[in-house]
Amino acid sequence: MNIEETSNPLKASDIPSNPMSRVKIILLATAGLIIIAIYYWSFDAVEFSFLKLKDGFPNMMDFVSGMFPPDWSIYKLVLVETILTIQLALIGTTLAAIIAFPLSFCAARNTAPSWIYHIVRFFFNAVRAIDTLIFALIFVAWVGLGPFPGMLAMAIHSIGMLGKLFSEAIEGVDPGQVEALESVGASRIETIRWAIFPQVSSYFISYFLYRFEINIRVAVVLGLVGAGGIGYILSQYMGHFQYDRVSVLMITILVLVMSIDALSGKIRSKLL
């Protein structure tokens, strides 16, 4: 028998069509068009324009040329405001850590009842959801301009982040040590002191330093709205078009942030 006569090659027309594949193609095409429309609408809303960048380029060149040479005659003022910026970040972060530390044990599933856990977690999420600048405006209306409202705003927002990180570290401890102490009749406080805290203390310090890094940058931004520090005098010099002094502040901010990040990073790498 001829093999060619008995073979029944599969033809393209014999392959059953899959209606679902067509539906998927239509859905994907529709989704793609919607995404493109959203991006087009968003670009239009923010008035994105390469033409504006081109037309404004001479202004940018004037700004850059005005920054040189830097006016280092203000170094004493810059030093004072740099110290204030560090103090803002330090006090704000420390106050946040003091409050977040006990609350974090109330926000961990393995150290708090369910109803307390949900209440404290909701508080952490709520204060994290509100930006530091919004808190700053609230406290400025309360106590007036100056470093104090900026520090309070920084502290309140930091409580949410530190509390979340602290509580997650607590939930990640080795349960074996906890169960060992509980089996010999240790109280809840004793269990936290001898089984949980030794496991999370290095993480707490690391998270504190990490938040301090962030708050250095936050302190600069808060200064732009009247909280003092480098950001405040930066806004003043920008408003008076003293770009040679602005360059000094930009250099100072760059050195400050990079130095704090490097130092904090080394300490955290040794802790973890």
Residue ranges and their predicted role:
Residues 103-136, 165-168:
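Cytoplasmic-entry segments and transmembrane alpha-helices of multi-pass inner-membrane transporters
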Residues 141, 218-253, 272:
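Glycine-rich helix-loop "coupling/hinge" segments at transmembrane-helix boundaries
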